[in-house]
C-alpha cells in the first residue's frame, strides 16, 4: 500500500469522526435548549399566577405594601431576564419574595381561609414542583452536553465547531432556602 492511500484513509476516518462528533454535539445542544424552554414554560405560568396572588393578598393585607412591592419588582425582573444565569438569579429573588408573601397568610386568618388564596397557593406549590423537576432535567442535560464536548473524539472538534460549556440553572448562595418549594399551610 502506498503512503497516499494511508493518508487518504486517515483523512476519511478523521472526516467521519468529525461528522459524528458534530452531529452528536448538535443533538446534545438542542436537548439543552429544549430543556431550558421547558423551564421557561413553567416560569411563565408562575409569572402569570403572581398578579392574581398579589391582588388577593392586597385585599386582606393592603398595608403590607413593602412585601407586595417586592413581589411585583421581583416578578418584573424575572420576566425580563435572559439566559439561564440571569433567569436563575431573578427566579431566586422571586422565590424569596413569594415565600414572604405566603408567610403573610399566617398573620391574616381571613386571607388564609380565602378559597381563592388557597387555590392560588396550591397552584403555586404545584408549579414550584414542576419547576424543580424541569430544573433537575435541565441540569442533567447540561451535564451530559458538557461531558460530551470534553470526551474524545468530540473534544478535538468541539471548539472548532463553536461548542462551548453551558451553565447550569444554579440557584446561587441561598440554594438551601429555595431548594424546596415554599410550604403552604392552611
Model-derived segments and their meaning:
Residues 1-186:
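A helix-centric hydrophobic-segment signal that preferentially recognizes long
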Amino acid at each position: 500500500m502506498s503512503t497516499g492511500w494511508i493518508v487518504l484513509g486517515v483523512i476519511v476516518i478523521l472526516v467521519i469522526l468529525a461528522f459524528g462528533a458534530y452531529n452528536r454535539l448538535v443533538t446534545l445542544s438542542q436537548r439543552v435548549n429544549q430543556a431550558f424552554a421547558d423551564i421557561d414554560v413553567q416560569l411563565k405560568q408562575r409569572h402569570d399566577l403572581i398578579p392574581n396572588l398579589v391582588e388577593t393578598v392586597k385585599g386582606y393585607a393592603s398595608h403590607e405594601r413593602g412585601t407586595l412591592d417586592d413581589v411585583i419588582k421581583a416578578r418584573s425582573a424575572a420576566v425580563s431576564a435572559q439566559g439561564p444565569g440571569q433567569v436563575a438569579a431573578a427566579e431566586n429573588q422571586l422565590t424569596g419574595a413569594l415565600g414572604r408573601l405566603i408567610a403573610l397568610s399566617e398573620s391574616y386568618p381571613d386571607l388564609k381561609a380565602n378559597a381563592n388564596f388557597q387555590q392560588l397557593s396550591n397552584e403555586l406549590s404545584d408549579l414550584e414542583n414542576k419547576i424543580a423537576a424541569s430544573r433537575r432535567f435541565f441540569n442533567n442535560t447540561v451535564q451530559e452536553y458538557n461531558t460530551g464536548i470534553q470526551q474524545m473524539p468530540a473534544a478535538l472538534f468541539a471548539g472548532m465547531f463553536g461548542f462551548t460549556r453551558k451553565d447550569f440553572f444554579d440557584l446561587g448562595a441561598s440554594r438551601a432556602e429555595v431548594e424546596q418549594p415554599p410550604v403552604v399551610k392552611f
